[in-house]
Regions:
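Short sequence/structural segments immediately N-terminal
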Residues: 20-250
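Bacterial N-terminal signal peptides
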Residues: 7-17
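Positively charged n-region of N-terminal signal peptides that target proteins for export
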Residues: 1-4
């Protein structure tokens, strides 16, 4: 029995002695971090710093496989190369895979022209990883997003309306600014001592968050007129909320 097999046997005995709930945790990263020859380690490092890792959304949730064992042949059984059209992380299947958790954005994306292109086999059709980090999930910066959009809506004129790339950047800059204001407001509300005032402010915070959610969904439909309208409503509500927090208005 080689050293890896012995280590696997010891780990298996340890897992057998742990509660059933703990055994359900994803073990992919544990094994991959222990190997010096794992391909594409940056992929693993990105995941480890991501909200996915913090919420125990392991590799198997997207790639498949068995995340409860340490024997590579068993753990990797059923995992397909992303180039395989049956793979859940193939670019055409990625929206449905991500949509298993991110339902709202997936439903909105299905209403877009981009989704039609993607499902029709158009290689220019964007998928989730076009705009989001494929592992960490964060949206690209507004400038990086503009660059992505300009590959089609730009000088090459693969698609019409070259101004859309610039408009997308500007709108996502606004979205990020409002999101930062909401984050600040939430932190300030939590420090309010009076329970009734804190509850009233939190209700106002939630009302300001509604158009933000709708703006994000409009972004996933790529309907930028709708996105802009929701951002204006969100901005108005956030400004009013911040004034109330500062006690400048009733």
């Amino acid at each position: 029995m080689n050293r890896l097999s012995v280590a696997g046997a010891i780990i298996s005995l340890f897992l057998a002695a742990t509660p059933a709930v703990a055994q359900q945790a994803s073990r992919c990263a544990d094994c991959h971090f222990a190997q010096n020859t794992v391909p594409n380690p940056d992929h693993l490092y990105d995941w480890d710093r991501s909200p996915h890792a913090r919420n125990n959304v392991g590799c198997e949730k997207c790639h498949g496989g068995n995340a409860t064992v340490f024997e590579a042949s068993i753990a990797h059984r059923g995992i397909l190369n992303p180039a395989n059209k049956q793979s859940p992380v193939n670019r055409a299947n990625l929206p449905a895979t991500c949509g298993g958790c991110h339902v709202g954005p997936f439903v909105a994306f299905q209403d877009s022209r981009h989704y039609e292109l993607l499902k029709g086999g158009d290689q220019h059709g964007p998928t989730c990883s076009t705009c989001h980090d494929p592992v960490a999930g964060q949206l690209l910066s507004p400038k990086a997003l503009e660059k992505q959009c300009s590959q089609c809506h730009g000088p090459k004129e693969v698609a019409p309306r070259a101004e859309r790339a610039r408009n997308a950047r500007q709108m996502y800059e606004s979205l990020n600014a409002i999101r930062d204001q909401l984050k600040l407001a939430n932190a300030m509300i939590k420090r309010v001592d009076d329970k009734q005032r804190r509850a009233d402010l939190m209700n106002e915070y939630e009302q300001a968050s509604v158009p933000m959610t709708r703006a994000i969904n409009a972004g996933h439909k790529f309907v930028y007129g709708e996105l802009d309208e929701y951002l204006k409503v969100a901005q108005e509500r956030v400004e009013k909320l911040m004034a109330h927090i500062a006690n400048r208005a009733n």
